[in-house]
Amino acid sequence: MSETRSVSMPAADAPTVDAPWPVSVLSGKIKGWIDRLGTAWVEGEITQWGGSGGNVYGKLKDLDVDATISFTVWSSVRAKIPADLGQGARVVALVKPNYWVKGGTLTMQVLEMRHVGLGDLLERLERLRQTLRAEGLFDADRKRRLPFLPGCIGLITGKDSDAEKDVLRNAQLRWPSVRFRVVHTAVQGDRAAGEVTRAIGVLDEDPEVDVIVIARGGGDFQNLLVFSDEKLVRTAAACRTPLVSAIGHEADRPLLDDVADLRASTPTDAAKRVVPDVSEELSRVQQARARIGMRLTSQVRGEIDRIEQLRSRPVLSSTAWIVDSRAEELGRYIARSAELAGRVVERGMQQTSELSRQLRTLSPQHVLDRGYAIVQTADGSALRAPADAPDGTGLALRLAAGALGATSTGPTDDIPSSAARLPSSPAPDARPASGAES
């Protein structure tokens, strides 16, 4: 049976190793594909914003993952969008992909751009809040107590910021010997969430850091959104070191406040809550010493009074009666002890005599004394049957007072009449020699 195969031939314009496309052809086809994509609404954060000749060139970053696109706002569109747009703004934009054939670059042409509505941000934030709450990250039983006196405090804050100065100054005023490990990060903008997240990990791995403080001197809602970043919040929740959030914003508190072990209203408040006040602690020590001194003095005085009362009792004025009253009782105990000891000794002697008698009865020598003999072969084993000593076998006879050598004449049924007068139940190993001659 024959089989027909269908072989697809490459299209006439398909590139091959022998007939490759020119770069311009490939670029033209890419542009054609991209032009067919049409327009799309996208949401993100502006991370770069710069103008030239009335046009704006920038970059738009995804709010959740590490993804960025370049965009262009022509001057005609720039005049129609909000004037306060710029780096750090969260926006929604209508874009059309545009591929530049000459340079081989892809950019998004912005047709419209506007701020993300506050309602949209709050709704997204609330959804994340509910998710984290359902996972138990806000539960009170997850909160850890701060150490009473941390040896080293990890501080995450902006470089040379007021928050940094407030924390350091107030903590050192309260406890001058406190140590800090400060990690400077961005506290707003597109780099802030990643830098703060990494800083938490670095300080959490440091065995000397006993507590971590994240401090920022307040700010508007947009600037504080970085502290509601999901990855940052989850990293803070998983932190093994007690963590304090000191963002300094009472309203619209970021999610970091909810997962932190302690929320401080301001950086100054954080400094006051992570270290004790040395003057207050010294005062407590002085008060405790005073209370202990008063208690000890009172207790000693009470014991002295009790001793004086005991000394004044008539029974202690003459102590001889204590000995006299116990002398007769002691005599009775001594007599009874002597009597009991005598009984024990007598009983022991009786038991010893009985055991001695039993030992003598069981002794092999006792059996020999009764006229029996132990017959042994040349190898020293006891002879138990006549068959074990055939004619001519050398034997040794152990008697009560010595030993004899003998030679077996073989088994015999002739037993001397005197053997009948021997005891009827000799020891198993002490049978009279049979058929042996000495």
Curated annotation (Swiss-Prot):
MF terms (GO), sorted A to Z: exodeoxyribonuclease VII activity; nucleic acid binding
Entry keyword annotation includes Cytoplasm: yes
Pfam families assigned to the protein according to its UniProt record, in alphabetical order: Exonuc_VII_L, tRNA_anti_2
Cysteine-cysteine disulfides: none
A Gene Ontology biological process term: DNA catabolic process
CDD domains reported in the protein's UniProt record: ExoVII_LU_OBF
Segments of this protein annotated with the region Disordered: 405-438
Keywords: Cytoplasm, Exonuclease, Hydrolase, Nuclease
EC primary class: hydrolase
Location (main, coarse): cytoplasm
EC annotation from Swiss-Prot or TrEMBL: 3.1.11.6
KW Ribosomal protein (keyword) present: no
GO cellular component, one term: cytoplasm
Catalytic activity: Exonucleolytic cleavage in either 5'- to 3'- or 3'- to 5'-direction to yield nucleoside 5'-phosphates
First and last residue of the signal peptide: none
Subcellular location(s) per record: Cytoplasm
Subunit structure, interactors included: Heterooligomer composed of large and small subunits.
Purpose: Bidirectionally degrades single-stranded DNA into large acid-insoluble oligonucleotides, which are then degraded further into small acid-soluble oligonucleotides.
Family membership noted in the UniProt record: Belongs to the XseA family.
Protein name: Exodeoxyribonuclease 7 large subunit
Organism: Clavibacter michiganensis subsp. michiganensis (strain NCPPB 382)
